Amino acid sequence: MSAAKPFEACELETRASILYIVIDIGDVKPIAFLGGSLDDLRGFPADARREAGYQLDRVQRGLDPDDWRPMPAIGAGVREIRVRERAGAFRVIYVATLADVVYVLHAFQKKTRQTAKRDVDLAASRLREQVARMR
C-alpha cells in the first residue's frame, strides 16, 4: 500500500478556470452493498455503525478488520466482521475476493451464540446472485 503523497507531489490541473487537485491515497477498493445490507447497517446503533464503517474502510484499503472470522459455509473468501457494543453484538458479512470490489452481503444484530441459519442462508443467496451476475 502506498503512502499518501505530500501536497506538493499532487497532480494539479486547470480546466475552464477550475483547479483540480488529484491526490493519490493508494489503492482503495470500491464497496457495494447487496440486497438490503446498507439499510440493515444504517439500522445499527450509532457506535456500532461507526465501528462497522471503520472496519469496512480497513477492508477497502486491503487490511484485515480488527475482529473477524472466516465464513466458509457461505462461500470461499467470505468473512464476518464482529462488532461488540453496549447495545449488543453486530455482524457484517462481506467478500473482498470477487473482482476489485468489497461486496457487503448482509449486516445484522446477533442475538444467539451461533449465527442464525436465516442470516447464513441470506448471505449465501446474495453471494450466489452476485457471482451469477458477474458471469
Predicted regions and their residues:
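Short, surface-exposed charged micro-motifs
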Residues: 93
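ATP-dependent carboxylate-activation loops
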Residues: 105
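Basic, Lys/Arg-enriched alpha-helical interface segments
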Residues: 2-89, 98-101, 109-135
